[in-house]
């Protein structure tokens, strides 16, 4: 939300550490990152761990990604997670994470007109195939689809949780049950 009379331009950076295995250290160097510019999605797979080899995790958002990195050392640099060097660079290096300590970091730029607001969606998911990841990322890159799905989930849980209600003399027990 921009409550000022001037247009605002924001740089937003998304960061995560993908493990895709039983241990972060054992995953180091084996996470393969693929950025698909046409679908605005980054997919990652663990090529080493046979149990997770066919699992795909993905990140996407409702805005255009400007740059990304899969290299945790590049992103953090001499800084730390609270103050990474990657935030001080004009752009990230667009490199894969193979052979490196992995991360998924990407940046977007958002302009918000004066006295207005803008909604942005960030997606994180897991699928069995890259094509499924792309289809879901495309669907939920639209804000309205996200809002509709949120309402569907709320309705589902209202339905489930509203089926059975227990009333006891103790209000605290009613809450627990």
Residue ranges and their predicted role:
Residues 93-97, 107-112:
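Beta-strand-rich interaction surfaces with strong enrichment in secreted/lumenal proteins
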Residues 76-79, 99-101, 125, 170:
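Glycine-centered flexibility motif
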Residues 99-103, 116, 155-177:
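Substrate-binding groove/exosite segments of carbohydrate-active enzymes
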């Amino acid at each position: 939300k921009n409550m000022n009379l001037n247009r605002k331009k924001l740089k937003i950076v998304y960061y995560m550490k993908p493990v895709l295995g039983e241990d972060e250290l054992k995953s180091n160097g084996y996470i393969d990152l693929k950025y698909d510019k046409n679908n605005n999605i980054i997919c990652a797979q663990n090529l080493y761990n046979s149990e997770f080899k066919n699992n795909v995790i993905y990140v996407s958002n409702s805005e255009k990604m400007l740059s990304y990195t899969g290299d945790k050392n590049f992103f953090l640099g001499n800084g730390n997670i609270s103050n990474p060097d990657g935030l001080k660079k004009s752009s990230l290096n667009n490199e894969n994470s193979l052979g490196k300590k992995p991360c998924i970091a990407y940046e977007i730029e958002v302009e918000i007109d004066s006295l207005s607001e803008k909604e942005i969606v960030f997606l994180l998911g897991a699928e069995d195939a890259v094509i499924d990841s792309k289809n879901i990322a495309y669907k939920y890159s639209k804000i309205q689809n996200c809002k509709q799905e949120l309402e569907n989930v709320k309705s589902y849980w209202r339905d489930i949780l509203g089926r059975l209600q227990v009333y006891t003399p103790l209000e605290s027990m009613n809450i627990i049950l």
